[in-house]
């Protein structure tokens, strides 16, 4: 298998964590007899400095000519005075729009070894493994009309979806549920919102195509509570843009650190992958960044763009093994290093690479 990946490391800790993820990807590819062609381009603040724009034309062209785009992080305090459409984050929004992905995949899982990092009790989070599928191009964030009328003191936004928009993201969610534990929870507010009534009716319609998947519906307010007191009850969670934004961020407490979470945006011309954490400029270049979210993002690339399930699972198992062995980055040690070996960004990347290699060689 040959996979062409554009790496846009971006700003802050982006280059550090992305570098460690790429070394793991290379190791896995070599061991499996696969070829990964890597191409590096600028995006975000580094592109503003060197190219005068957050998304250079050659970066976008390279993205559209790739099998996957691997983004590190964008942003920095020195760019906050720029107009919004000139800031690093604008480059991310532009590349997302150009690639056309409409389904955002965000895993939320609990590592037994990190239960102490979660504000929830260990017996609640242990064993939780949720995949959020969030519709990314419709809903309140994109609906029109939208306006803030400062003269009248009024503002309004429009939550709008078409049946086709709901169908396409729902099919992806069901297909993913078929590969997992065959349960799908659709989240809406159908007791109040007409757009949610369309959403629920459409999900039920598509469900007929997937009789092997169990379907349930939850109101978003109830779901926000259930996520915190019974997260193990959920497998694939499907929802619209606003609700998905809020719920997937809330679910980060299950894992206990944003540095552990990967994400993927699929369904468009080219899939876009990025760890959930930001650019964290305050720790950039100090070896303090947690690369595990980026490494797990690499696993998503292999799974969703390469079709390499065994290799993706090996990376995920390698991360778990390293945590079981007591290795931590500073954010995971949380000032209490008793019994842990605290590693730098590069050391953690090397430890995961070594562990994954050992597992694949001995498989």
Language model feature labels by segment:
Residues 6-23, 27-29, 150-221, 233:
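Glycine-rich phosphate/diphosphate-binding loop of Rossmann-like nucleotide-binding domains
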Residues 191, 199-200, 204, 208-262, ...:
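Accessory "access/gating" subregions that flank catalytic or transport cores
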Residues 1-5:
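Extreme N-terminal starter segment of soluble prokaryotic enzymes
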Residues 137-138, 142-180, 184, 190-192, ...:
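Glycine-rich phosphate/pyrophosphate-binding loop and the adjoining helix
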Residues 49-156, 242-244:
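N-terminal glycine-rich phosphate/adenylate-binding segment common to multiple enzyme folds
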Residues 31-57, 225-227:
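N-terminal beta-loop-helix "entrance" segment that forms/cooperates
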Residues 45-48, 228-327:
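Glycine-rich phosphate/nucleotide-binding loop
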